[in-house]
Amino acid sequence: MALDTEKIIEDLKGASILELNDLVKAIEDEFGVSAAAPVAAAGAAGAGAEKTEFDVELTDVGQEKVKVIKVVRDITGLGLKDSKDLVDGAPKNVKEGVSEDEANDIKAKLEEVGATVTVK
C-alpha cells in the first residue's frame, strides 16, 4: 500500500480542528508517541533548576586600566599580554562556570580597582 502524501495533506486541510485533534490523539495512542515539542519540555525542566554556575563579565575597565589588568592576571592566571588583551576587549568574560561565591569574590576584586562587572 503506497501512501499518497499530497492526498493525505489535502484531506487534512479539509478537516475541522476537532477532527484533527482526534487524529493526533489516535496517532499518539497507536504509536506511543507524544505531539508535544521536545524543546518546550526541556525549557520547562530547566526553568525550575537553580543556577549553580556563573560567568563573570568585565563590562567596563574604568579609569585604572593597569590595576584592572593586574587583578585579571591574578584571577585568571593568564600572562601579561593575554590579560591586557582581555581587558582591552571588554566587555568579555573573565571567568566562566564558577560558583556563586567565587563569582562574587571576583566581582568584588575587580570593582575595588574601578572596573564594572556583571555576574551572569
Swiss-Prot record:
GO molecular function: mRNA binding; structural constituent of ribosome
One GO term (biological process): translation
Subunit structure: Homodimer. Part of the ribosomal stalk of the 50S ribosomal subunit. Forms a multimeric L10(L12)X complex, where L10 forms an elongated spine to which 2 to 4 L12 dimers bind in a sequential fashion. Binds GTP-bound translation factors.
Protein name per the record: Large ribosomal subunit protein bL12
Gene transcribed to yield this protein: rplL
Pfam families: Ribosomal_L12, Ribosomal_L12_N
Domain of life: Bacteria
Protein purpose: Forms part of the ribosomal stalk which helps the ribosome interact with GTP-bound translation factors. Is thus essential for accurate translation.
